[in-house]
Amino acid sequence: MKKIHLITLSLAGICQSAHLVQQLAYSGKCDSNAFSICLKSILEINPTSFIAIYGNHEKNLIIGLEILLSTLTFSSFSYSYIELIKYISNMMIIEKKLKKSRTAIYSLKNKISVISSEYYLNYNIKNLTRKLGELYLEIISSLGSRIVIKGIKDFLQDHQIQEKIRCLLFSGIRAIVLWKQYGGNQLQLIYFRYFIIKKAKKILYHLKDAT
């Protein structure tokens, strides 16, 4: 079913963002391609298709699909798992607040459009990270419910890592918006959990079989 397919990929986008936040917070680095994909997903305001948001290929969400699968099957129940769920829950709270603020949504769309135009002129990923991080601080953080990130103090105090983490939280919230647009909701994670697990396994199987 196409709806379950898109819901599964949206959830993978959420999980990928949250997982990369954890990587940065504890090691100071994360998968560069996955980060770039998450970053550029924020720029896609009017995508031609769902997968266009994530670089036109499901393989760009492979990390998120693996994290989604391990989360729904409880295969790696640990402090890291609890932390991941907490980040996702907090992003969902912020998405609800954002949805209620037409002013914030309007401002975000306009400013993202400008940032996107600038990025596609010079493809400067560092500049894009800085500008999206600043936009997160300016608009999303001002909504309240700031997300407290756990990790190694030296990494958390690094300005560039802070910017990257803000961008990943931003992309996670973007993925939550997509998830809801395709009919996703929290009860679904309980009642349709089996179907989402099955779909995630199927997508991963085809992706790995193709490589």
UniProtKB/Swiss-Prot annotation:
It is found in: Cytoplasm; Cell membrane. Keywords: Cell membrane, Cytoplasm, Membrane. Its main location: cytoplasm. GO terms for cellular component: cytoplasm; plasma membrane. Pfam families: DUF489. It is a peripheral membrane protein. HAMAP family: HflD_protein. Belongs to the HflD family. This is High frequency lysogenization protein HflD homolog.
